Design a protein with these regions (language model features):
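Conserved glycine-rich cofactor-binding loop
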Residues: 19-20
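Conserved glycine-rich Rossmann-like NAD(P)H-binding loop of the short-chain dehydrogenase/reductase
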Residues: 33-48
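The beta1-alpha1 cofactor-binding region of Rossmann-like NAD(H)/NADP(H)-dependent oxidoreductases
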Residues: 45, 64-76, 105
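Substrate-binding pocket helix/loop in short-chain dehydrogenase/reductase
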Residues: 98-100, 107-109
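Active-site helix of classical SDR
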Residues: 123, 158
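Residue(s) in the substrate-gating loop at a strand-loop-helix junction
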Residues: 142
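C-terminal helical subdomain
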Residues: 182-186, 201-249
């Protein structure tokens, strides 16, 4: 963990999966809004690069190596950060595109662990702090949690389960003044597909070839907007897609 000690009393935004893509873009935008940002992910070198960019722009950033599938990592984060105003559950991912018949259970377990149990672990650990500040939990889901597609069963199942978790949580903590929002993006041009295809750059590039995808900043804009509404305003969920994916349409490629 590295940090820059702050006595400014700034609000604190915790972002998981903050080493690249949507997480990194979200952290930078929260910093620009005056938050001290807490960056968590597995790739500490990349986290440091994001943090240095934030600090160079006059912001405050703290870095923790956090694997959301590790109870120890998550508990350590919660102990180190007693104040949390915003939690962005962004860590997640897909692995493979096998059919149901060809399903690889190891991949299904990993997707459930990182997308569902990862969100559970971090949210559960930070809820006491969020209740103290009447904060907000924002979870980056996916249109895969609302629409299914061939080859996506493992990821679809995980994201549907994550959505159920979020919807129950919203009901359970409303009386504590904690807002709960889900942001469900469609196709975003990040490292998502590179991870899904085990680093196969050709397969990953084909996902984005010939279509205009959302950018990480597009999604970060929406996350920060939802988080900065008045405390009386709860946005249950927002679904955002590139124009070729509206209404569940297949990309025009």
């Amino acid at each position: 963990m590295t940090s820059e000690t702050s006595t400014s009393g700034r609000k604190v935004a915790v972002v998981t999966g903050a080493s690249s893509g949507i997480g990194a873009a979200t952290a930078k935008q929260f910093a620009a809004e005056g938050f001290r940002v807490v960056l968590g992910a597995r790739r500490e070198d990349k986290l440091e690069a994001v943090a240095e960019e934030i600090r160079a722009a006059g912001g405050e950033a703290t870095v923790y190596k956090v694997d959301v599938t590790s109870d120890d990592d998550v508990v350590a984060l919660a102990k180190a950060e007693p104040r949390v105003d915003v939690l962005v559950n962004n860590a997640g991912g897909a692995w493979g595109m096998e059919s149901v018949e060809g399903a690889v259970e190891e991949k299904w377990r990993w997707m459930y662990d990182v997308n569902v149990l990862g969100t559970l672990r971090v949210t559960r650990a930070l809820l006491p702090a969020l209740k103290t500040t009447s904060g907000i939990v924002l979870t980056v889901g996916s249109i895969a949690g609302r629409q299914v597609y061939t080859g996506g069963a493992g990821y679809n199942a995980a994201k549907h389960a994550e959505r159920a978790l979020v919807e129950v949580l919203r009901q359970e903590v409303a009386a504590d003044g904690v807002r709960v929002t889900e942001i469900d993006p469609g196709r975003v041009h990040t490292d998502f597909s590179l991870v899904r295809f085990d680093g196969d750059e050709t397969k990953a590039a084909a996902v984005y070839d010939g279509v205009e995808s959302l950018t990480a900043d597009d999604v970060a804009d929406i996350i920060v907007f939802a988080a900065t509404r008045p405390k009386r305003v709860n946005i249950d969920f927002l679904q955002v897609t590139p124009i070729d994916q509206v209404g569940g349409a297949k990309p025009k490629k």
